[in-house]
Amino acid sequence: MEVKGPSGRSFCCESEGQFKSCLKRHTPSLLLPSSWKGNSGSCLMAEALHRTSPTPNSCPLPLPLCRMSGVLCSRNLFTFKFSLFQLDSGASGEPGHSLGLTLGFSYCGNCQTAVVSAQPEGMASNGAYPVLGPGVTANPGTSLSVFTALPFTTPAPGPAHGPLLVTAGAPPGGPLVLSTFPSTPLVTEQDGCGPSGAGASNVFVQMRTEVGPVKAAQAQTLVLTQAPLVWQAPGALCGGVVCPPPLLLAAAPVVPVMAAQVVGGTQACEGGWSQGLPLPPPPPPAAQLPPIVSQGNAGPWPQGAHGESSLASSQAKAPPDDSCNPRSVYENFRLWQHYKPLARRHLPQSPDTEALSCFLIPVLRSLARRKPTMTLEEGLWRAMREWQHTSNFDRMIFYEMAEKFLEFEAEEEMQIQKSQWMKGPQCLPPPATPRLEPRGPPAPEVVKQPVYLPSKAGPKAPTACLPPPRPQRPVTKARRPPPRPHRRAETKARLPPPRPQRPAETKVPEEIPPEVVQEYVDIMEELLGPSLGATGEPEKQREEGKVKQPQEEDWTPPDPGLLSYIDKLCSQKDFVTKVEAVIHPQFLEELLSPDPQMDFLALSQDLEQEEGLTLAQLVEKRLPPLKEKQHARAAPSRGTARLDSSSSKFAAGQGAERDVPDPQQGVGMETCPPQMTARDSQGRGRAHTGMARSEDSVVLLGCQDSPGLRAAWPTSPPQDHRPTCPGVGTKDALDLPGGSPVRESHGLAQGSSEEEELPSLAFLLGSQHKLLPWWLPQSPVPASGLLSPEKWGPQGTHQSPSAERRGLNLAPSPANKAKKRPLFGSLSPAEKTPYPGPGLRVSGEQSLTWGLGGPSQSQKRKGDPLVSRKEKKQHCSQ
């Protein structure tokens, strides 16, 4: 027979007595070893928990994890009895703090191995074990290996409750590790917090050997009976995630109100034992007791720190020192996930959160063992102080552990998203994962719904069932701290928190609300005005259906011949100058000015006001600014050219006067020189030209909308269309450049061609009265009347033309001659002739120049004979 100690040493026992003596001799060292050295198979928590060296007499905490191995032969029946050390109030600080027991069984040939592990009670993690009594007696049977724990009295009051039943199958060839007592709460306090050991327990172990495969395995029954326990809230011990407020761990008066029946089953698998497999058959009914349901607290029990403290989690568990068990690693991983919020709360901006969470796992467990009444805040404060006093070299083990846990977490997220992606085509919502700590907002579930355009206030609907993109595995390498043990600075592990990737959402384009469209239409109508259709009705009526909208086929393009004719006219320079002659000079000046802020509306209003003015009011309005411009822009050379042109027009005008009989012809002959009595065809042509240009000047300067001046038109004789003096009313008198000798000859040469173009230009000249509403009327009013308002009668009608002629035939005054010389400079030879015609011409021209014919208008008038041709044609027909 062989007994193995915790250090791996073997003790040979040849007989039952020697085995008992070995047990007695090695029991203190087995339960409370003087030292603990973690081997390669132990986990980090085991190393942290076994840093102290307790002694049998004084038991400082934390208590170590112990293991005792013994070889029991089924052929030799013997009974051994050993006592577990139960701490008193002086050693532990809390009465009733006892040890737990873990029995492991294995079958090798005809031998069975029982592995007994002891661990202190009071842990909230998976390593918590109930109380084992001070005495255990094993009585193996002849045909059935039975370990019977003899009952004994317990100091704690309370009703007796039946034994707990744990049934398991022991396969041949592999160890069966069972948890002696489940971690499910058995007895609760009145406030639902904390257990403490209340007495001893009786353990009934019934075993039988399995023969054959696992399916035909013979049942082994382990009946465990224990005294009442007081369960402590796991959330308060393990990080405060479930129960954030600090919970007192003090032991309360034992009130046994619940005795649970737990059946934990495990089944052998390759590489370990799996959880959640079918349970073996239950024990005989005689060994079972109905559960007693608590009347004061029938609600759900709080989740443990690792989320496994439930009936389903009370199946077989590995011994605490078996660190290579995947189940213990998984539970530590869940503990680490729950400790991270606590670490972030104390180190919000530190990258050591993951490593600190790993450090809290053994520290909080040790503190819970040592002082169950310690609050959560006090435990965290002690843990943080211990972390600050830990060197970088000692922290390395926790950084490595955090690195592995980060890899587990990333792999878990990837598996969850992969499962969602696999279930995406079927459009089934993914099952809820048992994540106790939410890491960001959950991904929205993809539901297959028909695509539709939502209303204005309706929610958006997902359009299709799209699989979420496969996330990339984040890099979880932690930067190790520098090997500087003398520095106490915290080493920062650069571990970026993984971000959950959301599946792509297909957005449905929003429909434009009709209210917005109507508002846009109203704004455009307000800016552009209501559009009129071909029938002249507003656009609103057409929208209402009152007026039918014309079809696009009804629209006819303009005549291409007309367009080509307009292009041909615009290509001619003379046509362009003729069109410029009918444009208002002020409008043209404003249009050509470099000022970009030209107000067309104000200009149009000003022109409309001038349209309603009389001739005298118009002269009074425009005379002062024209005088200023005339002084600034007049040039002597231009005056000489105008005088020469006036002399030639004077002779042409006299020839026209002699050609037409008139009662007042004598008066006209007296005012004209005798050299111009003879005439020829050239003179007749000049007479007609002079008359036409005179009429042209009157048309361009006239305001036919004036009612006072229109009244005088029918009373005048037909011959009054011709001026009585060549210098009166001519274009040169108005200081227009069209009367120069060069322009006159050009007009004579182009006379016939222009007469042919007049009918085609009627559509362009039809609106000349609207464009030029401010000039003189188209009546034979002499230019001298512009500055002589006294010649108008009391009724607004003009005096007789003969009186005007007699007034104009008077000799020029010296004042007029004085004004002429500084204005025009030297006189031409034609002006020095003794006849008074040129003098009168200069006088009339001077008065008109001071009146309306400023030099500013000379730059914009180049082709005025356009309208005069029409008047010339009418005169020839007479």
Curated annotation (Swiss-Prot):
Bias (Pro residues): 278-288, 427-444
Q: Per the record, where are the segments of Basic and acidic residues compositional bias?
A: 537-551
Q: What ranges does the record list as Basic residues composition bias?
A: 476-487
Q: Where is this region: Disordered?
A: 273-324, 417-512, 527-560, 624-693, 709-757, 775-878
Family, according to the entry, reads as follows:
Belongs to the NUT family.
Please report the name of this protein according to its UniProt entry. Answer: NUT family member 2B
